[in-house]
């Protein structure tokens, strides 16, 4: 594991113009151990970052540069806030130079290249690097992340579903029926990215609430692969994502049928014990109901454990900011571990209210 030194970590960002890119900039500009070194955008080459994102005035003095002009191999770590396929095309060169890679897209999330190619419709060009990569969900893979050279940063939906279900199934626990799991998830519009699309237009998304990807969503195989790794066997999951008319935030309602032999389990205590030492996972008091606004612009994820009527249906409520714990904040959390830094370095922001 690389150890943090007195010198700052030299950080590059490929694809700094999207929402996850600017969120990385916001977080890293406040990080006590980071020196932002390069931010790439072919289209915005030469444009000062603060001209595009005025919230960064006085914080980020760099200008965007075309990828071929940026000295990414001089960085200690490079974040890819890019479409799928970009990181895998550049990873080998960076790794050869000793630069670590954290990809916020899906290039290193799925270990099965056939599954990746089926869902993302592009060939996987570096299966050897993929085999050495680590799935970057800190609360599940902390030790492996600390030694990793390549991180596949989890998707936003998978983060809520996996952390919401892990205490129930990890280690092959026989507490709930793993064949009938349901994830009913809602995301703010920023989850669709910054590109111009009809479905993200104000007139389309405002005052509207809709499901999408019901027949199949790219995060489904990612979630199932990790659930099966936790459970040690096959898992059945019904996953239905929704788009809600807010900018940022995610609310996932998870359903699990309690097995007869587990009816006397104290599920509140189970979750509290599992996440007692996690700096960014908050298991709320019994009977509490989480709200997306309670995590806005923070790296916190809040979980509420519910058992309506004391019956056999367990309901787990999970909220996070899809751009922070669901993307860029989680990526910074991974970087901290990779370089031997305190896990919460640069991530201690309090959520914004109202």
UniProtKB/Swiss-Prot annotation:
SUPFAM superfamilies (UniProt xref): Glyceraldehyde-3-phosphate dehydrogenase-like, C-terminal domain, NAD(P)-binding Rossmann-fold domains
InterPro entries associated with the record: AGPR_AS (IPR023013), AGPR_type-1 (IPR000706), NAD(P)-bd_dom_sf (IPR036291), NAGSA_dehydrogenase (IPR050085), Semialdehyde_DH_NAD-bd (IPR000534)
Molecular functions per Gene Ontology: N-acetyl-gamma-glutamyl-phosphate reductase activity; NAD binding; NADP+ binding
One GO-annotated biological process of the protein: L-arginine biosynthetic process
Pfam families: Semialdhyde_dh (PF01118), Semialdhyde_dhC_1 (PF22698)
Key words of the record: Amino-acid biosynthesis, Arginine biosynthesis, Cytoplasm, NADP, Oxidoreductase
UniProt-listed Enzyme Commission number(s): 1.2.1.38
Main location: cytoplasm
Domain of life: Bacteria
UniProt catalytic activity: N-acetyl-L-glutamate 5-semialdehyde + phosphate + NADP(+) = N-acetyl-L-glutamyl 5-phosphate + NADPH + H(+)
Residues at the catalytic site: 156
Functional pathway: Amino-acid biosynthesis; L-arginine biosynthesis; N(2)-acetyl-L-ornithine from L-glutamate: step 3/4
Enzyme class: oxidoreductase
GO CC terms: cytoplasm
Annotated localization: Cytoplasm
Family: Belongs to the NAGSA dehydrogenase family. Type 1 subfamily.
Function field: Catalyzes the NADPH-dependent reduction of N-acetyl-5-glutamyl phosphate to yield N-acetyl-L-glutamate 5-semialdehyde.
PANTHER family given in the database record: N-ACETYL-GAMMA-GLUTAMYL-PHOSPHATE REDUCTASE, CHLOROPLASTIC-RELATED, N-ACETYL-GAMMA-GLUTAMYL-PHOSPHATE REDUCTASE, CHLOROPLASTIC-RELATED-RELATED
This protein's name: N-acetyl-gamma-glutamyl-phosphate reductase
Organism: Bordetella parapertussis (strain 12822 / ATCC BAA-587 / NCTC 13253)
Gene: argC
